[in-house]
Amino acid sequence: MTNPFVVLLGLGMALATSVADAQCAVEKRCGWLKNPTPGNFSLLDRSGEWTISEQGGYQAPGIDNMPDMTTKGWVVTNAGEHGYGCACLDVQVDEKSRLVTRLVSAQPLPLRRCKLDPKLPPP
């Protein structure tokens, strides 16, 4: 005969694991990748702005593996090739803090894709 306590404990652990997995799920987010000044990166998508890194401060794990994002069109707005472009990022995020908590991959996109998206605010 199975102990009811053991069954409940097992169910509780399974539920806790599924909640943790949901919080750590990798999402594809597409929008304006902004790099206005050295060390500052953010993504502006349909749901708002997500901080990827701040100069002298927060750095999302994985940002060092970001490829050259200027290959599909990049608008230079500041010295040293700083500006913005259109991109899709595979990321984990913290909804409350609006931080990218892990950058898994990044793909530059043509500027036209973001410009034509009616749900995407301007950069």
Per-range role (PLM):
Residues 6-16:
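Bacterial N-terminal signal peptides
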Residues 22-77:
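N-terminal secretory signal peptides
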Residues 64-123:
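Beta-strand-rich cores of mature extracytoplasmic or soluble domains
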